[in-house]
Amino acid sequence: IASRTGSSIHGSNDPIEAVSGAGVIYTDIFVSMGEENIEGKFDAFEGFQVNEELVAHADPGYLFMHCLPAHRGEEVTDAVIDSPNSVVLDQAENRMWAQMSLLTYLCNNDAWHTYRELE
């Protein structure tokens, strides 16, 4: 998809390199809720917190995305997630509509009836 649209996807183990010139910065939590073996996890992600210093290397019009819930102060700072560049609330709302549409499709179409016949 990226090559057909003229886009590119880039990953890096260097946080500054990863965001340099980026139009979108997308992160997730470093440690899942209820995860027991967290020793060393924060060390492994050192330098990857999305903060004002890091996003200064991105495109000035960058968008910040996070699948939520965010652990403020861990993977992202308040300044970034609450900034005008953050689209996390729109992202969450769009996810809700997509999930509702999928449920509607499954409940009102042959996909649901086919599943019920398999039981």
Kindly give the residue locations of the regions a language model identified.
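Structural/interface elements that position substrates and couple domains in central-metabolism enzymes
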Residues: 1-119
